[in-house]
């Protein structure tokens, strides 16, 4: 499988969060409702494939009751915030991150991690 995103509205750079690693930023001003698809691989929860990809458990998105999406592109670069500018939108087995507000160019994009991910990254105490 070749992951070849053709998305040109974003770039990856050092996060504005101290010790946050890299983050996802806008190259241009964007409007509320603009969105992009989180590209990746779907695996069944608790399957052999899920167990074999445990190294990325903290980054998996739950899609419905039985599926997990392992992000392979820019969707996996958005960091956590309790005041996010992105929300998750599901369409069947597809996941999109959608802007919840207008943002200027060079804005870092955030969504709120699940409680599981917040705990795994040590964010619940912060």
PLM region spans:
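Conserved catalytic SET/PR domain of SAM-dependent protein methyltransferases, capturing the structural core
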Residues: 1-126
């Amino acid at each position: 499988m070749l992951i070849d995103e053709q998305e040109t509205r974003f770039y990856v750079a050092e996060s504005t969060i101290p010790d946050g690693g890299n983050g996802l930023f806008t190259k241009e001003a964007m409007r509320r409702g603009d969105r992009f698809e989180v590209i990746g691989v779907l695996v069944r929860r608790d399957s052999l494939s899920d167990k074999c990809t445990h190294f990325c458990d903290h980054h998996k998105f739950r899609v419905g009751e039985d599926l997990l999406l392992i992000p392979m592109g820019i969707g996996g670069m958005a960091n956590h915030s309790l005041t996010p500018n992105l929300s998750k939108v599901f369409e069947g087995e597809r996941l999109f991150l959608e802007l919840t507000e207008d943002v200027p160019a060079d804005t870092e994009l955030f969504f709120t991690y699940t409680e599981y991910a917040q705990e795994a990254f040590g964010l619940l105490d912060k």
